[in-house]
Amino acid sequence: NEADRRAALAELLPMQREDFYGVFKAMKGTPVTIRTIDPPLHEFLPKREELMVEIAILKTKSASKNKKAIETKEKLLRAVEELHEFNPMLGQRGCRLGITYPEITKMQAKAIFEAALQVARKGIPVKPEVMIPLVGHVEELKRQKAIVLEAAHEVLGKDGSGVDYL
């Protein structure tokens, strides 16, 4: 659900920021292209078959004792089945993942710009370039670009705080 996603992204943001900081610092002003997250959605989900086995085991042990755990696993199984894709390499990934879950793109853009700002404040030139992967239509790019620009404005302010980005 969205609350769980946002909590996970809040944990991921500082790790991403730290990684980007190290890259920007090492590159000393050379443009750095960062491709936003684009793994297939199924890579983030538990395996359907494993969930089914876990549910069966919980039910055979003691269904009444494990009622809450069974309900939780069954809810997760339903979500996994809803998100199943015939060909995950072409489906819900790249910009389409960011369109469905804009908070993912926003978190990563914030991490990029926060890291860039930290490096710039140390007097080291920085030039982040944000790449939106697997764009199939101009509207997909426009939607993702708007999220990235919003994050840049939030982090860098109106003047860009001396960080030039693409």
What name fits each language-model region?
Residues 1-166:
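Conserved alpha/beta-domain cores
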